[in-house]
């Protein structure tokens, strides 16, 4: 069984949730990002609050991702601290909280740096009671990070094609729980947005365990 949803950010500002609710079974919202280059700065997505409130209004389950430029454990942790203080705290989420590993500045850190950045991000948020994971392409995970230590976290994997089933290369991997099947290929409410399939009942798991702002059932 799979559940179909989307991931959106300020780039989709103005999208109608009254239309989006008809096909979105979950949403992963960009909570924040780090600007790359020499003057890196952590920022909150300008439309996160609007999108979060709209999703809650229409009872659409929500997760969050942070677009990172972290190059080591400490910087990954600092991303998580920023996200917790400015986005997560005081809110409830039905899907995991992800660190997005794709920026070239981040990838310059090499396999050890990128892997440790994921650990820093995820371990801090786990200590705060969140279900955590990472977004990374198959090539990035297996050639620019160390995949084995990261199997403890849920993996959101982009691999774009027109099929409704994930490629065999990733379908059998134990922690690949969300597949991003389209990068801007879903036309919804006048916007071209990313489409995702989830293969895990995250809302039930998270609520039962009392994670992501929920009290344990």
Question: Residue locations for each model-derived region?
Answer:
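Alpha-helix initiation/capping motif
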Residues: 20, 45, 137-138, 146-147, ...
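Structural recognition of alpha->loop->beta junctions
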Residues: 82-99, 103, 144-175
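Substrate-binding cleft of extracellular glycoside hydrolase catalytic domains
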Residues: 1-131
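Conserved beta-strand termini and adjacent loop/short-helix elements that scaffold enzyme active sites
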Residues: 67, 135-137, 181
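Basic/polar, cationic surfaces and motifs that engage anionic cell-wall
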Residues: 113-116, 120, 134-135, 146-152, ...
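Functionally critical loop-and-helix segments that line ligand-binding/catalytic clefts
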Residues: 1-12, 17, 150-217
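Short, solvent-exposed loop/turn segments at secondary-structure junctions
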Residues: 34, 104, 139-141, 162, ...
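Aromatic-lined carbohydrate-recognition surfaces of secreted/lumenal glycan-active proteins
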Residues: 125-143
